[in-house]
Amino acid sequence: MHNHNNRLVITPGEPAGVGPDLAITLAQQDWPVELVVCADPALLLARASQLNLPLQLREYQADQPAIAQQAGSLTILPVKTAVNVVPGKLDVGNSHYVVETLAKACDGAISGEFAALVTGPVQKSIINDAGIPFIGHTEFFADRSHCQRVVMMLATEELRVALATTHLPLLAVPGAITQASLHEVITILDNDLKTKFGITQPQIYVCGLNPHAGEGGHMGHEEIDTIIPALNTLRQQGINLIGPLPADTLFQPKYLQHADAVLAMYHDQGLPVLKYQGFGRAVNITLGLPFIRTSVDHGTALELAATGTADVGSFITALNLAIKMINNSNE
């Protein structure tokens, strides 16, 4: 094992988007950890000069101890772009480059070289246009680290929302919620709240699937047939679960002040509340991986690339949360 405790790997994502800008902006302050950016050094230097920001790159040395990152510098794990990058213009020729940065960073996190992986935004459509099947970061990292199940969670300072199902059409959601799937998701959520967030007795509040959580079977049977039995089994294993509660009831201060996390049954049940409450400050976290992974909660913002107007807030929050999670894991 390396002295990895103070070493994070960052993937800026789509090279024509704001990811490189944000990595360079992050580098303008001191960090208590080493920031290793997996990207094309020429891309970062060109973008830094377009942004008129100072940037020194230091080649990553796996066998050297981690050093705290000084303002104006980044450590680079180099991957070359295939074609010239024009800010704001997607090019299918660089799709393999993007996937290679993710693979390299993921492998380093799996091996323990890096204590955490923080991802910038990718453009899923252009990766798929290159003939590379790509659903998203979460699925890519799960597949590469041989995880059968991972859990997507978004968090702000005040609220954490995990999802029982992620990127599915609404029509497919009820069929995807089974006692077995809930058992896996809640076990991972409970475990990671303890090990990565340092919460000894997590309180998890669970949404029902249907309006009014099924109204006792008058508005859908999923609560009675699936959700309630699954929660009862998990309670017998010592997991603190409250619910299922109607989602419109659950997202009120009197419940949320006691919740360490909320489990929503589908993407748009839980995330609109969180995004309204903390837009620009939300972080995406993948639970269940053998390493810490946080991410910005925004897209590639192609129109802002190289303009100097991209907001670095979500990236800073994602980095700070990763550092906090590293400290919790080391305790």
Curated annotation (Swiss-Prot):
Q: Output the Gene Ontology terms for molecular function.
A: 4-hydroxythreonine-4-phosphate dehydrogenase activity; cobalt ion binding; magnesium ion binding; NAD binding; zinc ion binding
Query: Which processes are annotated in GO (biological process)?
Result: pyridoxal phosphate biosynthetic process; pyridoxine biosynthetic process
Q: State where substrate binds.
A: H137, T138, K275, N284, R293
Reactions catalysed according to its record: 4-(phosphooxy)-L-threonine + NAD(+) = 3-amino-2-oxopropyl phosphate + CO2 + NADH
Keyword check for Cytoplasm:
yes
Annotated EC = 1.1.1.262
- CC per GO annotation: cytoplasm
Record note on cofactor: Binds 1 divalent metal cation per subunit. Can use ions such as Zn(2+), Mg(2+) or Co(2+).
Q: What class of enzyme is it?
A: oxidoreductase
Give the chief site where it resides.
cytoplasm
Q: Which residue pairs form cystines in this protein?
A: none
| Residues reported in the UniProt entry to bind a divalent metal cation | H167, H212, H267
Q: Which cofactor is essential here?
A: Zn(2+); Mg(2+); Co(2+)
- Which key words are in the record? Cobalt, Cytoplasm, Magnesium, Metal-binding, NAD, NADP, Oxidoreductase, Pyridoxine biosynthesis, Zinc
Tell me which InterPro entries the record gives: PdxA, PdxA_fam
Name where it's found.
Cytoplasm
Pathway it works in: Cofactor biosynthesis; pyridoxine 5'-phosphate biosynthesis; pyridoxine 5'-phosphate from D-erythrose 4-phosphate: step 4/5
Does the record carry Magnesium as a key word?
yes
Quaternary data: Homodimer.
Q: Which PANTHER family match?
A: 4-HYDROXYTHREONINE-4-PHOSPHATE DEHYDROGENASE (PTHR30004:SF5)
- Record-stated family: Belongs to the PdxA family.
**Leftover remarks:** The active site is located at the dimer interface.
Q: What does this protein do?
A: Catalyzes the NAD(P)-dependent oxidation of 4-(phosphooxy)-L-threonine (HTP) into 2-amino-3-oxo-4-(phosphooxy)butyric acid which spontaneously decarboxylates to form 3-amino-2-oxopropyl phosphate (AHAP).
Return the protein name.
Answer: 4-hydroxythreonine-4-phosphate dehydrogenase
What organism is this sequence from? Yersinia pestis
Show the taxonomic lineage: Bacteria, Pseudomonadati, Pseudomonadota, Gammaproteobacteria, Enterobacterales
